[in-house]
Amino acid sequence: MRARMALAYANITIELREILLSDRPDELYTASSKGTVPVLQLPNGSVIDESFDIMKWALEQTKTDWLDINFEDQLLMIKVNDEEFKPWLNKYKYHQRHPERAYEYYQNKCVEILSKYEQTLSNNLFLFGKKPQISDVAILPLVRQFAHVDLTFFMKNLPHLNRWLETWKASTLFQSIMKKYDKWEPGQTPLIVNFNHK
């Protein structure tokens, strides 16, 4: 999601190969031995197989305005999101698989991190001020996942973060990347996509 949003914002056209993680084609492993998505193969043959790195690459091509405010602080926020928040979120989402702790324990661990965003957003439209930055879009997917576990709890306890999330969900940028595509099949006619174009 976040890689596609950056590609859309940067107005970059790609050949899209939509796959199912339950049925990963050999071509995915040919491009990246990790076998995870997203993977971006550049015209020169080099491969970017981390979503944040794809975001950064896309924005550096044409749209650097998401990178111009306290970039090092943004990187730190994204690191916490990806390395600390995500593991707690997975335990919260799938708490039945982690019975060593109560559901509320995992929820509270997530909120410890999200409350910092909540405090910031009580005074700002976005995480680093009045305009979006790469950090907003980088943490968006996991915040959205957290919200959808218990939306009533999220709306009640993190109202500013909820306002921020709803703003993004209503944006044309978010809507532009939510279209569903058919599964890619080897040998098919290439699907050329610019998410920013309707």
Question: What spans do the regions from the language model cover?
Answer:
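Short, flexible loop/turn segments with low-complexity composition
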Residues: 67-73, 176-185
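GST-like fold's C-terminal all-alpha helical module
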Residues: 77-170
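A short hydrophobic/aromatic micro-motif that marks alpha-helical segments and, especially, helix-coil
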Residues: 65, 151, 186-187
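GST-like domain detector, emphasizing the conserved glutathione-binding G-site
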Residues: 1-112, 125
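Acidic/histidine-enriched, glycine/proline-rich intrinsically disordered or flexible terminal extensions
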Residues: 181-198
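A generic structural-conservation signal
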Residues: 16, 130, 177-178
